[in-house]
């Protein structure tokens, strides 16, 4: 059938093909021990559809027994409108989240609330992340990297301080959680240091 045929322009056929290909690639990634990164939350560009980035749309994939060996990372932890969905999805055994992009889009104070919510649910599944790209001609990725790293660390400190102040964790546990978010969780997920 020619590529330009009307059959390939049918949304239902394209959707079925996309679903098949995604699940095939996800299964192979699991077999190879490679986490699958899925963009969730806000995005840029006229091609972007906000409702398509709701992580709750992944629930059938995340519940698929054939994909249990595949780890999924919800990039941006649902940034903005969908962060609460990401929190709930972390209860799945093979789902992780990073809070990248939120470091750039929202204030450090608001980010600290998001980080605290994530830590109170499943701290062993939360990872630091940035979202480095040249946003404007005036600001390059180096500046964005510095800024997002600073805001991430400050938000993490505010979240952990609040948890200590509220009696949820000790200072020792706060230090442990900080190390987990900034290093250990990613090292475990990606197998850093294993040979």
What are these regions (language model features)?
Residues 131:
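Active-site glycine-centered loops adjacent to acidic/histidine catalytic or metal-binding residues
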Residues 3-128, 136-138:
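Catalytic pocket-lining loop regions of alpha/beta-barrel enzymes
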């Amino acid at each position: 059938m020619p590529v330009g045929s009307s059959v390939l322009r049918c949304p239902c056929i394209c959707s079925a093909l996309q679903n098949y290909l995604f699940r095939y690639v996800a299964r192979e990634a699991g077999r190879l021990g490679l986490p699958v990164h899925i963009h969730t939350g806000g995005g840029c560009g006229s091609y972007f559809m906000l409702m398509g980035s709701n992580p709750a749309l992944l629930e059938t994939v995340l519940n698929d027994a054939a994909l249990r060996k595949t780890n999924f990372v919800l990039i941006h932890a649902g940034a903005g409108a969908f962060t609460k969905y990401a929190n709930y999805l972390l209860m799945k055994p093979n789902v992780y989240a990073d809070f990248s992009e939120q470091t750039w889009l929202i204030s450090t104070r608001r980010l600290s609330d998001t980080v605290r919510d994530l830590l109170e649910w499943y701290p062993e599944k939360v990872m630091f992340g940035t979202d480095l790209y040249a946003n404007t001609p005036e600001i390059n990725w180096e500046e964005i990297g510095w800024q997002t790293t600073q805001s991430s660390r400050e938000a993490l400190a505010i979240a952990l301080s609040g948890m200590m102040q509220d009696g949820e964790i000790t200072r020792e546990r706060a230090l442990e959680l900080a190390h987990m978010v900034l290093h250990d969780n990613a090292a475990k997920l990606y197998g850093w240091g294993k040979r």
